[in-house]
Amino acid sequence: MESNRDEAERCVRIGKAAIEAGDKEKARRFFSKAERLYPSSEARVLLDALEKNDTAGNGPQSEKMSKSTEQPKAEKDSSGDTGKGHTQDQVDGVQRIKKCKTYYEVLGVSPDAGEEDLKKAYRKLALKFHPDKNHAPGATEAFKKIGNAYAVLSNPEKRKQYDLTGSEDNVQNNHRNGGFDYHRGFEADITPEDLFNMFFGGGFPSGSVHTFSNGRTRYSHHQHHHHSGHDREEERADGGFSMFIQLMPIIVLILVSLLSQLMVSNPPYSLYPRSGQTIKRVTENLQISYYVSKDFKSEYNGMLLQKLEKNIEEDYVANVRNNCWRERQQKQDLLHAAKVYRDERLRMKAESISMENCKELNRLTSLFRGG
């Protein structure tokens, strides 16, 4: 579909931008998504190139560089949390999330918890640990982990796969400096902030906007003005209008198709009898048989009839000529094969072709010449 193609192109653009930003994991994810939506050579080439570069760069030196770039980034994030006031309860809550070994422990639910239990637990924890409300050290990472836990457990396929491992530590034991690790193989398809907005219809009124993606994309933080209820109504209206604009080409195509079907009428004749056209007639010049409806005489007579019969004869001659060409081609192919393989059966089969259309074409040609 065209919409899939547009979305795939958008994913390719995002992937290219991620490469320029040095985020290969994000680039790989979006190139793969583009391939799933609308396979293209561009996405495939970019993905293959990325895989080759990763294979070539997975040595000790690249691992050392990766650790050196992650450490300042972690320090930067943690400094952002500690720059604001927080309570001891918030610190204790972050430590609890940090010590959790399974996503069920993170959300505080049992392994057989249903969808409603997961939603209820997520709502409570997301509001409590959102970075706009909780400024304790590590609150941002705790919020990420809560979002990732809900996104995985609320997805039946991901949850089933996760349950097979028992805990996060069984997937990959690579904690770094005692912090959270999100490269575990169980990652959400949606960012924690987007998930939060889906539940609560946006962030906190006075807050800042946080963008996360389980370690695969960068963490960004910027202030924005609170949207009033009127602004949200305008955004919904704009969204509806945008959807209408996107659907407009499809609506136009449907209307054009319907109009064309209404405007196109059936031909007044047929070379073979069919429903509604069963009355046999013969053209005056070449004696070609054709079939018409019962009200044909009232609509076609005089010059109009002569013009129509001329068209009928032209259609018939063109049809006979094409069929004659096919008969000749078939016979020549069989004779050639019989000669190459010295097969008498092929020669006899070629000779048995009646060439009826070619005979009819010769008859019509003699009529044209007045023979």
From Swiss-Prot:
Region (Disordered), start-end ranges: 48-92, 215-235
Pfam family, one: DUF1977
Entry keyword annotation includes Transmembrane: yes
UniProt-annotated location(s): Endoplasmic reticulum membrane
Cytoplasmic side: 1-238
Domain J: from-to ranges: 102-166
Top-level division of the source organism's lineage: Eukaryota
GO cellular component terms, A-Z: endoplasmic reticulum; endoplasmic reticulum membrane
Name of this chain's protein: DnaJ homolog subfamily B member 14
Organism name: Xenopus laevis
Gene label: dnajb14
